[in-house]
Amino acid sequence: MKQNKINNITKKQKTILIILFTFRFINSKQIQQLLNHKDHRRINSWLKDLAEKEYIERDFQPVFGTLTKPAIYFLSVKGRDFIRKTYFVDDLYLARLREDRKRSKAFRIRCQIVVDCFLLLFPNQVTEYINVINTWLDQGFKLNKPKQIQFVTPAFYEDLDCTLTSLLKPDAYGYLKNTKGITHIFFLILDAYIPKMMLRTKIQHIFTTLEEESWENDEIRSLQFYIVCPNNVLIIYLKRMLPTLLESFSSNIEVGFNLATRNQLYKRRQNPTDKTGWINLPSTEY
């Protein structure tokens, strides 16, 4: 950690800035879950104070006659400056955050779905994740937990020993190492109105990259792609398209595609013990 004396915000508020740096756009309820804090009023008080002190910006447009949705937050110029002066972070990633005020609604929603993927798919890691991020920022990035999927956002991609993250640019990444080898996991969040032609191009780019780039080594056991779709229409489209691509793909390493809708993912909110119900399409079956 760099030396940066800032005394006008609390330790919890500094943690909130780290969360925003990690996930970019995140709503107040998600922040509350990541902080593992029971009092939402306290969370809102910290956020209000940070906004008034211009460390963060608030994206909130109330619609008359509808239920109030939680406000969305992202780092301001002052917040980014705090991160830059306090931690050793990737300057290129931090530079991209300068344009966050101009980001589309679809991009902001995608960032929040990434948060939900972590909260819903890895509930046993939520309470310790803030400490994990703090360690990465203070002591340097390191994936050192065997037999456990470690969840990584684009904030830390430059530190990863995985060339595919920079080539495929997934919305989030997971790393699993056990006695059988390494599994690289890529999370892709599809926008609500993505054209089918654009989706086809996106999927074909994955296969082109895997065929043309040098990424295989003896340690890698498999590549797994988890695609969160906005509806069943795209699930059906992918189920028709992927088998043909998997049949023509040649590799000693298993490549799997796992499909689910947002609604399937969010069912775990009501019953965390329920399985998401991913549709699995592994290359070993083609």
Where are the language model's segments positioned?
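Nuclease-adjacent, charged terminal/linker segments that flank catalytic cores
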Residues: M1-K102
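Amphipathic alpha-helical segments that form well-ordered structural scaffolds
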Residues: Q30, D116-P123, H205, T209
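Catalytic cores of nucleic-acid endonucleases
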Residues: K169-P170, L190-T244
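Inter-domain helical "communication" segments and dimerization helices
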Residues: Y87-E99, F141, F151, F156, ...
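Active-site metal-binding core of divalent-cation-utilizing nuclease and nuclease-like domains
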Residues: F118-L119, T127-I182, I194-T201
